[in-house]
Amino acid sequence: MKSTVEQLSPTRVRINVEVPFAELEPDFQRAYKELAKQVRLPGFRPGKAPAKLLEARIGREAMLDQIVNDALPSRYGQAVAESDVQPLGRPNIEVTKKEYGQDLQFTAEVDIRPKISLPDLSALTVSVDPIEIGEDDVDAELQSLRTRFGTLTAVDRPVAVGDVVSIDLSATVDGEDIPNAAAEGLSHEVGSGRLIAGLDDAVVGLSADESRVFTAKLAAGEHAGQEAQVTVTVRSVKERELPEPDDEFAQLASEFDSIDELRASLSDQVRQAKRAQQAEQIRNATIDALLEQVDVPLPESYVQAQFDSVLHSALSGLNHDEARFNELLVEQGSSRAAFDAEARTASEKDVKRQLLLDALADELQVQVGQDDLTERLVTTSRQYGIEPQQLFGYLQERNQLPTMFADVRRELAIRAAVEAATVTDSDGNTIDTSEFFGKRVSAGEAEEAEPADEGAARAASDEATT
């Protein structure tokens, strides 16, 4: 088999393939064997009919069509493997010559990962916000802790912000009751902003068994986005009593003996949280700095696939009713054209980031090991509250292991870029990033997830590189 590659653009190629007819002989033999099992010819046992008679029964051209259709995927894959292109998505294949006894010729046009010239990472400079911790931050954490240990006491007075109320809700649209919007005995903390927009303002000042009607847009269901008349009835009012922030509370809520020790611990927690936020800021700033210096050509089909995914997610809550989706956008002061423009811009940026990090991983020869996949499995399984083995099975069943593999590889690439760059805060202080991205899972967790990850490493790596 011979193949050549034509560069149609930085992101698209045409692969010209010529397959000698003799190389199709094994394909013919396999097809004849399968047909012999299916076609009954007088005088021959099942599976024993000669190829010539089968060909006469089916027709030479029909046989050739079947052989070519079956052979195209493997011959295309072979041509890709023999070239240095990295396809993105499905190819557009056109058979240009198909005659019995003659060489098979076809072309395959496909988008590819573009070649990207990367800058010197050691010359990269990144600046982010400094970490600042004030007493207000610690006070907020302490207040949250006091709330967790607070007690609720029934009170006979109108509702105030901070109270916890039991409420009934019902709604109508144009005078029609909406059954799915009705609920009884809901517990709600006034001022939290949860449940329905406008609810907090509506209940403030009401006493038990009093009602009020307010207007709100429904968030889900067949009336999603429509204005509804919502009736809220308060059934009970409870006041949250918070413990005093003293040494006794510190001993109740923590392992510390004094409130000062507890505040110091909360300050450390705030610092760790802000360090995590800073690490994410550094990561994004590093990618943005690279994108400013690098030209990343965009494969149109890849961008379109990303855009289609965004649109699919947006429509999923409306049963993929595009007409209703367009109406909802107008009601929100937007339009379908504006949504499409924003979604395409976001899709283009996302594709640029992916292609940049893939090129960076290639340049740095990033290798994804079992420990890297274990770390991702353990971290992700914690977020969902499931076991690593269970997550692995879920990903494997849905063929999402290659996606996880690619994500881990990109993350390792950006870690390497951050380590090579000079990172400072806006005050000019150099930031040590060595502790930001290098945390490994414990030996026990790794051992627990190890059987899954051996399979993950093999399956994901194999599929991601095909």
From Swiss-Prot:
GO molecular function: peptidyl-prolyl cis-trans isomerase activity; protein folding chaperone; ribosome binding
All residue ranges annotated as the PPIase FKBP-type domain in the record: 162-243
Function: Involved in protein export. Acts as a chaperone by maintaining the newly synthesized protein in an open conformation. Functions as a peptidyl-prolyl cis-trans isomerase.
Keyword Chaperone part of the UniProt annotation: yes
EC numbers on record: 5.2.1.8
The species this protein was found in: Mycobacterium bovis (strain ATCC BAA-935 / AF2122/97)
GO biological process: one example: protein unfolding
Protein name: Trigger factor
Region (Disordered) residue spans: 428-466
Compartment(s): Cytoplasm
Family: Belongs to the FKBP-type PPIase family. Tig subfamily.
Alphabetical list of InterPro entries matching this protein: PPIase_dom_sf, PPIase_FKBP_dom, Trig_fac, Trigger_fac_C, Trigger_fac_C_sf, Trigger_fac_ribosome-bd_bac, Trigger_fac_ribosome-bd_sf, Trigger_fact/SurA_dom_sf
Keyword Cell division on entry: yes
Pfam family, one: Trigger_C
Catalysed reactions, as listed in the record: [protein]-peptidylproline (omega=180) = [protein]-peptidylproline (omega=0)
The gene coding this protein: tig
Assigned keywords, A-Z: Cell cycle, Cell division, Chaperone, Cytoplasm, Isomerase, Rotamase
Free-text domain note: Consists of 3 domains; the N-terminus binds the ribosome, the middle domain has PPIase activity, while the C-terminus has intrinsic chaperone activity on its own.
